[in-house]
Amino acid sequence: MAIRKLKPTSPAKRQMTVSTFEEITTNQPEKSLLEPIKNSGGRNSYGRITVRHRGGAQKRHYRIIDFKRNKDGVPAKVATIEYDPNRSANIALLHYVDGEKRYIIAPQGLKVGDMVESGPNADIKTGNALPLANIPVGTMIHNIEMKPGKGAQLVRAAGNSAQLMAKEGKHALVRLPSTEVRYLPIDCKATIGQVGNQEHENITIGKAGRKRNMGIRPTVRGSAMNPNDHPHGGGEGRTSIGRPAPVTPWGKPALGYKTRDSKKASNKMIVSRRKK
């Protein structure tokens, strides 16, 4: 998908780029696969802010995506490639031969009219979903499950792909886009190929208004606040933060502080950590 640079009719638009949406074949989503989304504005059930800098997003519908790919042995035809406002990747509408319709993440190279299938006996071709046990070593994959039958959790963003490195007993060794190498149960399903919409990472937002449409509000620097609002706040004029290193609004180290649980059960599945 190509990127278009806008004419500099304003200072914001001088650097702004947008997608040309060449791969999109329709702007009318399948109504039976839509659900409403309630904008929480970053508040929990008590009305308190639990996530800062959220609110005011453009209203949108959620597209129900088939991450489980559990319709084994039933071929499906790609009917449309569509834009999804809830994710960076595009989505593809599948029409199964038994009449059911489902959305999947659109892989790179998938076109309208292509046939896809899932199950252990499916062919090794883009868009097909198979257990890791049935995928050849070295294959590029995406939409990977972490528990068999739970649905894909890994490698779902635009342009991403992982590589199946080896198979050892009940586990498969997979290298993720972050360069982390980890074991996954060999019965977990994955989809062949790379996630589409590769050019997404090259889009320049350009202006604050586009971020507001995404539901992201401004981030105020801690040093611009009062001392009762942030540990960096206070002082006369522009002063230093008065600490050895920056901290969060709650006093925890802001840079390089590991937040992952050292006793997490899945730690033993990680062979090598990602490169910083």
Swiss-Prot record:
It comes from the Bacteria. One of its GO terms (molecular function) is structural constituent of ribosome. The keyword RNA-binding applies. The keyword S-adenosyl-L-methionine does not apply. Gene3D superfamilies: 2.30.30.30, Nucleic acid-binding proteins (2.40.50.140), Ribosomal protein L2, domain 3 (4.10.950.10). SUPFAM superfamilies: Nucleic acid-binding proteins (SSF50249), Translation proteins SH3-like domain (SSF50104). Disulfide bonds: none annotated. GO terms for cellular component: large ribosomal subunit. Keywords: Ribonucleoprotein, Ribosomal protein, RNA-binding, rRNA-binding. InterPro entries: NA-bd_OB-fold, Rib_uL2_dom2, Ribosomal_uL2, Ribosomal_uL2_bac/org-type, Ribosomal_uL2_C, Ribosomal_uL2_CS, Ribosomal_uL2_dom3, Ribosomal_uL2_RNA-bd_dom. Signal peptide: none annotated. Residues 219-276 are annotated as: Disordered. GO terms for biological process: cytoplasmic translation. Belongs to the universal ribosomal protein uL2 family. PANTHER family: LARGE RIBOSOMAL SUBUNIT PROTEIN UL2M (PTHR13691:SF5), RIBOSOMAL PROTEIN L2 (PTHR13691). NCBIfam families: rplB_bact. Part of the 50S ribosomal subunit. Forms a bridge to the 30S subunit in the 70S ribosome. One of the primary rRNA binding proteins. Required for association of the 30S and 50S subunits to form the 70S ribosome, for tRNA binding and peptide bond formation. It has been suggested to have peptidyltransferase activity; this is somewhat controversial. Makes several contacts with the 16S rRNA in the 70S ribosome. This is Large ribosomal subunit protein uL2. It comes from Alkaliphilus oremlandii (strain OhILAs).
